[in-house]
Amino acid sequence: MKKYLALTMAACMALSLAACGSSASSITSSSAAASTEATSDSAATAEATGSANITGIAQCCDVGTLDDESFNQGCWEAVKGYGDESGIEYNYYLPSGEDASDEDRETLIRQAVADGANTIVCVGYLYGPALAWGATEYPDVHFIAVDVNGFDIDSENGTIPENVFCVTFKEEEAGYLAGYAAVKDGFTKLGFLGGMAVPAVIRYGYGYVQGADAAAQELGINVQMNYYYGGQFYGDEKITAKMDGWYDGGTEVVFACGGGIWTSAAEAADKHDGKLIGVDVDQNYLGVEGVESGKYKANPFVTSAMKGLGAAVKNGLDTVNAGDWSTIAGTNGNFGLEEGDYVGLPTDEASWNFSTFTMDEYNTVLEKIRNGEIKVDNTSDDATKPTTSSNITVDYQV
């Protein structure tokens, strides 16, 4: 499985990004119970063909929107691409608001099954309790749970049901690479804007702090970082005002990590000629499109801290469809550089927007993480801050 994921990650990322620019306006909506919204892609209504094991695929999101140009959409493009290639009907289901409950998420699973899905991709760690219920309620349904681990499902023992496959990533490694590269490229006043303080976002952020610190030590310089969780996965006037204050106060680059919250950071960066680091997928295209449309004066994206969402989802679906579920049943695949090229920065020329940081420098630090010479703390507890040197000052804001 690890070998297959390594081979498919780049292809899945390319497929995902090619489609990410499309609008969700072609998707029709219908109301569902318990204050949830179920939506179905109109292009996916054809009869299922060529599949003996998957009769229907559903993606259920824990929070946020589908067109976040990041986590939810990265998974969805893999689901959509798989359905289109295989002739399998696919749908997605969203909670109606950021305050959705476990019962709301159970309702989404219930409706997905009622609509014919026998394979459900649940994205976001908040799906843990709903998965504990759903796996028992629907023992013949396969669940692929992205950014969910066993303790999200079973807080006492961490047991993963046999019809669930959990996929997690070593986001701290991607965050480390982003922070290291930013400082090596000359940035000394950094920012981290997280969505909610959930495990994956925390790992990205703490890795970013550690990488920036390591580069500062190598260069013998001091760097400063503002650090803040917006408490949401979307941008709005409040978050934009916060980012305006940062950039106006001298912040040079912000790692925006949390679904659609990047829009506020990008808006503020454009006003103050600041820079941005994307997350989950290569978000450089958003800056390019923004310039072409006149939305931005210049492309704000320096790089993106990525993880192989599309590869993980596609691999899980392939495994179900091939009748090989037993090879991943009840397990948690945790993917980083030791396991393959599952996290990193985009290295294609179009997305490499560094001024002085070189590809050789990137490959050197990447291999040191891969072989264990550099160990990145993977703490995902917001109360436990990473250990740093005197070369970095982090202002953890609330």
PLM region spans:
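Bacterial signal peptide processing site
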Residues: 21-23
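Positively charged n-region of N-terminal signal peptides that target proteins for export
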Residues: 1-11
